[in-house]
Amino acid sequence: MRPLILGLATAAATLVLDQATKLGLLLLADLPARQPVVLAPFAQLVVVWNRGVSYGLFQQHTELGRWLLVGVAVLAAAALGAWMARAGSRLLVLSLGLIVGGAVGNAVDRVAYGAVFDFVHLHAGGWSWYVFNVADAGIVAGVAGLLVETVWSEARGDAAMRPDG
């Protein structure tokens, strides 16, 4: 499979899985009325409407802020997509695809709902992680992949990480 097709397929799969889980939890499972749903002693499903970015930073409560975040996500996805089109490494295109799919998934939420629907809450004892969704997990996994690719690229001395690579 050509690298670009692999990256685009990864982005599409991430987007579809993200939106399917959100629609399923909102419409079919009626999570807003049933929350919290305990999955395990350390995991539950809840409803959080995130008007900010990662970890709730930069909360935007105005329409201007909402649309600025949508615009930033679209521009970032386009830039990463352009990088993906020129990338040769499988890990690089997979990582970029995860990030693009996650960014677009969260942008769809902002357009449809005015905020991002987060629902997975992990916790143990007094420790609690931020509530997140499939798109967020894709973005984090993609960034981790970029870090691994950077280390491998440096070790190989190649140009796989450069956008013109």
Curated annotation (Swiss-Prot):
It catalyses: Release of signal peptides from bacterial membrane prolipoproteins. Hydrolyzes -Xaa-Yaa-Zaa-|-(S,diacylglyceryl)Cys-, in which Xaa is hydrophobic (preferably Leu), and Yaa (Ala or Ser) and Zaa (Gly or Ala) have small, neutral side chains. PROSITE patterns: SPASE_II (PS00855). The chain crosses the membrane at residues 64-84, 88-108, 128-148. GO terms for cellular component: plasma membrane. It is a multi-pass membrane protein. Pathway: Protein modification; lipoprotein biosynthesis (signal peptide cleavage). Keywords: Aspartyl protease, Cell inner membrane, Cell membrane, Hydrolase, Membrane, Protease, Transmembrane, Transmembrane helix. The active site is at residues 118, 136. One of its GO terms (biological process) is proteolysis. It is found in: Cell inner membrane. One of its GO terms (molecular function) is aspartic-type endopeptidase activity. Its EC number is 3.4.23.36. This protein specifically catalyzes the removal of signal peptides from prolipoproteins. Belongs to the peptidase A8 family. HAMAP family: LspA. This is Lipoprotein signal peptidase. It comes from Methylobacterium sp. (strain 4-46).
